[in-house]
From Swiss-Prot:
It comes from the Bacteria. The lineage of its organism: Bacteria, Bacillati, Bacillota, Bacilli, Bacillales. One of its GO terms (biological process) is lactate metabolic process. InterPro entries: Cys_rich_dom, LutA. Belongs to the LutA/YkgE family. Is involved in L-lactate degradation and allows cells to grow with lactate as the sole carbon source. HAMAP family: LutA. It holds the Pfam family CCG. One of its GO terms (molecular function) is oxidoreductase activity. GO terms for cellular component: cytosol. This is Lactate utilization protein A 2.
Length: 242
């Protein structure tokens, strides 16, 4: 099996450790991994801001970059949902690119979805002794319907005590450009999220979308809260029995 890594903008620029963790995970699974260098932004920021033609240019570049990939795996439910749902919307009426968009969507997987539903991982052997909560991101849980897969994997991590997070599926207030355009509302939403995290007395927040982690983690730092923030890939890669 050969897998191509779709790294995403946030991992490339802000969370390189997440990309490295995905590589470690795939190596542990015995999966051959490559990195198509032609990949770029999936186009979601442009699409959500109304710049349809710019989004199409990004989508076409992504389609070309992963044209020959058997599987495409990304550590982002948000970017995966863009490829799955909105590429097809953008290219409706364009038979050539619509078919290519469908072909790309059919081969693109969010990381935990791939590990559980393609590789069938049910005996993950890593260790992390922490009391934690898991934040369900909007695009991943609603757009892709991926809810149990990350929790199933985290339940296999030795020493990890996952507490139930109240209102775990409530938006953290990031929403891409929403956090910029509606900053006061976004701030209220993330403060509410932090209140629920603190109520669990957890010292670790785990998520599967880096936009959420950047938003919540940044707010935690500004409020001087001693709560660590990790991507699910980082947790799975910690203490691997290599």
């Amino acid at each position: 099996m050969k897998v191509s890594l779709f790294i995403t903008c946030l991992s490339d620029v802000f969370f390189p450790q997440v990309g490295r963790s995905v590589v470690e995970i795939m190596n542990q699974c015995g999966v051959e991994l490559d990195f198509p260098e032609g990949q770029t932004c999936c186009g979601q920021p442009a699409y959500n801001s109304g710049y349809q033609e710019d989004a199409k240019l990004a989508a076409k570049q992504m389609i070309k970059a992963f044209e020959h990939s058997e599987y495409i795996v990304t550590p982002s439910g948000s970017c995966a949902s863009m490829v799955h749902h909105y590429y097809k919307e953008m290219f409706k009426g364009d038979s050539e690119w619509y078919e290519k968009a469908v072909h790309l969507a059919d081969r693109t997987y969010e990381l935990t979805d791939f590990l559980v539903n393609v590789l069938g991982k049910n005996d993950w052997k890593s260790k992390l002794v922490e009391k934690a909560v898991f934040h369900q991101s909007c695009h991943m849980s609603r757009a892709l319907g991926i809810k149990e897969e990350p929790l199933k994997l985290l339940s296999q991590v030795e020493g990890l005590d996952i507490k139930e997070l109240p209102y775990c599926q409530d938006c953290c207030g990031f929403g891409g450009t929403f956090a910029v355009k509606m900053s006061s509302i976004s701030e209220t939403m993330v403060d509410e999220k932090i209140k629920h995290i603190e109520a669990t007395e957890a010292n670790l927040l785990i998520g599967a979308d880096m936009g959420c982690l950047m938003n919540i983690g940044g707010r935690l730092r500004r409020k001087n809260k001693n709560i660590q923030v990790l991507h699910v890939a980082e947790v799975l890669a910690k203490g691997l029995n290599k």
